[in-house]
Structures are given as C-alpha cells and as structure tokens.
Design a protein with these regions (language model features):
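A conserved amphipathic helix/loop scaffold
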Residues: 2-219
Length: 219
C-alpha cells in the first residue's frame, strides 16, 4: 500500500533509514499529499525522489502496457501494468523494469537505487500478483531477511509478537476452508510450550492444519 499522505518529517525519516543501511520499498502514489491531503508541489514521489534516484510529474491509466527488463520468470500475460502507472524518469537509479509500450518505453516501471549504506526501490505501477510476489521475494532475499517463514504462503499465515509477560509468541493460522500442510525446519520445532491449538497434527517435520485450524506457541 502507498503512503499517500504523511508529513514531510516522515519521509525524511524514511530516507535516513535507508541511508543508514535499511531497505526502503515505496509504491506508486507514495508521498502524493501532505498530512492535510494537500498535493505536494515537490518532485514526486515527494520527499523521496532524491533517495529513490528517480522522479515523475505525469501519470496515466495503462492500456495494453506490458513490462520489460527483469521478469523473474513471470509469464508474459502476468507482465502487465494495471489500473495506474507513473511515468518515472531515473536520475541515478538502476531500472529493473521498463514499460513495454511504444509510447512509454523510455519510462521506468520499477527502479533500484543505492542510497548511503542502504537501498531504495520504487514500484511505479500496479502489477500482477505473480510479478509483485517475485519482485518482493527478490528484495527480501537481497536484504538477507529471507527465512523459513517466508517460504510459507497464504492461506497459512504466521504472526509473531511479544505478550504482556515479555514472552515471544508465534501464531500459525489456516485462513481457509481446506486442510493445509506445511513443512517446518528444525528451528521451527524449538517451542517452549503450546498455549492453544485447534485442528493441528504434527508428524515429524510436517504440520497439518484443519480448515480454520491454528496453533499458538511460546517460543
């Protein structure tokens, strides 16, 4: 989701986060207005154009606009700009994907820019689910944040948090009406205790969740 409205200070902190070694990913319509929903007159994406190494001042609704460049193995049918696209011009950023269209082929659809110790990515259009999944997986892996939890996809959901006692808690949910089975690595079996479960079967490294089943663990 785009950070459509926010005060200038928020974007300054995001830029500083990336400069200090973070990975920042922003999408189309980010920074379009301030906290009062007044359109920013700065170069778009306002407050982030410098760290993104790219900017735009025009946008349009795509019609039969494909994407070229890094495809991540996604089929041609899935390489389409959808609903909204910004005509981004790089000022230092590397272009990951261009628009595949005779009128818009010089403009960037996805960019990557080194900023201080970190990296900034800008996604200038709505893409297919298949493409955005591949793109974000690539970004997470490059940032060194990919682990076994990222291998598990919807409808099995994993959430973690800290309870009032300061204990780390993990929740695994089956958000569907069908039984789901996932393979767990050894590190996932390091559980202090199971707090609550419903419709759960664990055999060796295979966890099976009944429809709408869940397990809550202290780890």
């Amino acid at each position: 989701q785009a950070l459509y409205s926010a005060p200038k200070e928020v974007f300054e902190r995001l830029s500083a986060f990336a400069a200090n070694g973070g990975t920042l990913v922003a999408t189309f319509k980010t920074g379009f207005t301030d906290e009062h929903v007044k359109v920013n007159c700065d170069r778009q994406p306002a407050g982030l154009s410098e760290c993104m190494g790219a900017w735009y001042d025009r946008f349009t609704a795509p019609k039969n606009v494909g994407m070229s460049g890094e495809t991540f193995g996604v089929s041609k049918d899935e390489l389409q700009a959808q609903d909204f696209m910004e005509l981004v011009e790089p000022t230092g950023a590397k272009v990951i994907a261009f628009y595949d269209h005779y009128m818009w082929k010089e403009y960037a659809a996805v960019t990557k820019n080194s900023w201080g110790k970190g990296t900034c990515y800008y996604i200038a259009c709505k893409t297919s689910s298949a493409y955005i999944k591949k793109l974000t997986a690539s970004i997470v892996k490059e940032a060194g944040l990919w682990g076994w939890k990222q291998e598990i996809a919807f409808p099995v959901i994993i959430k973690e948090g800290v309870n009032q006692e300061g204990k780390k808690i993990r929740y695994l949910f089956n958000y569907s009406g069908k039984e789901q089975s996932v393979k767990l690595p050894k590190e996932a079996s390091k559980v202090s205790r199971v707090l609550k479960e419903e419709g759960v079967v664990l055999k060796k490294d295979r966890l099976t969740l009944a429809p709408w089943g869940f397990v809550v663990e202290e780890i």
